[in-house]
């Protein structure tokens, strides 16, 4: 498979502290990849750097185009969607209005895009006229996913989608992520729960202190490397 996203030698930091140190990886079209690592490993920083939300140096290419000179909005228009940590919805708006507002910048039929999202998330379709604040935590996270999908991204960046959810709700959210991936969208998923992330991602990239220390099919990752990533031993 050809690379949809290519990262080479990516470096980023905050206030003089290095958060990413020469990170290189690729994501193919339609591929789901889990970014795994302990707190502070650089997972969230990597996703933000891809959107231009934090300063970074290195070679970033998406669909053979250079992302470096592009502002965040231009990167989104190129086909990158982003769901940040936490549930980002407008609680006073209906589910449908949350989706339609997210699609305002797209020169397409928003109603068609809304129905496409509802096909992926039947629970949201059943509550389309309800206010977002009435949704469960898992449903709000699904709405966040749906809002990101209104731009029809070819690559979806997810930052800790199960954070703060009960195991049952987290399972529902990851089932939704699986449906997104099955529909052909590439997914780069930052997640602290390796067991949960690997239910949808056949490949994992392991980060420790801002560096890639493992990359490959899940079955190829040794127990020793996993212990180093999560426990430093």
Whereabouts are the PLM-identified features?
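Glycine-rich phosphate-binding loops of nucleotide-dependent enzymes
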Residues: 2-233
